[in-house]
């Protein structure tokens, strides 16, 4: 078996397991969707902060930034499902203010960069993953009752997966020269 075939098999098995977890988490129960995306938000924010903190003169508070991201995800879930009022976002905003103000007193070499990387984690990871709840919970106009529609976020992910898979296959079969060598796989 060649290295390319082995790589394809590993990608396929990983992809099938990932899709199974995502479909199970999105399609059946709202609690599963909320838990799945809170977990994904927490893990990706934690990983992002770890990568950013490896840079010289950058120090992002990994724990509080991750906790804020997970809280934002859960706050969106509660608000969109109709369980909590809009005031549920106030603790998140206070946490963001804390992260900004605390940076002034930590005497870091470049606090503006630390702010930028902290806010980027919230805008690049936490906010988009929290928006899944906006798609999943819909209110019906006549009675205003909120209902869970897991098919909508699932369809968005299916479109993304199909597009990504098609791009990978086209690039593997047709492409001989990488358009962007720094970001192209393999």
Where do the language-model regions lie?
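Membrane-embedded alpha-helical bundles of polytopic integral membrane proteins
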Residues: 2-186
């Amino acid at each position: 078996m060649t290295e390319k075939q082995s790589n394809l098999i590993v990608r396929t098995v990983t992809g099938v397991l990932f899709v199974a977890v995502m479909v199970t988490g999105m399609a059946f129960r709202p609690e599963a969707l909320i838990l799945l995306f809170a977990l994904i938000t927490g893990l990706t924010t934690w990983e992002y902060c770890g990568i950013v903190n490896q840079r010289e003169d950058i120090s992002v508070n990994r724990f509080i930034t991750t906790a804020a991201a997970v809280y934002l995800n859960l706050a969106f879930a509660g608000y969109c499902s109709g369980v909590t009022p809009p005031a549920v976002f106030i603790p998140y905003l206070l946490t963001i203010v804390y992260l900004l103000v605390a940076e002034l007193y930590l005497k870091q070499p470049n606090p503006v960069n630390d702010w930028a990387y902290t806010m980027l984690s919230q805008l690049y990871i936490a906010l988009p993953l929290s928006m899944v709840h906006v798609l999943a919970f819909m209110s019906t106009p006549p009675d205003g009752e909120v209902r869970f529609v897991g098919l909508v976020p699932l369809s968005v992910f299916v479109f993304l997966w199909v597009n990504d898979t098609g791009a990978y296959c086209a690039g593997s079969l047709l492409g001989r020269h990488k358009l962007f060598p720094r970001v192209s796989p393999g």
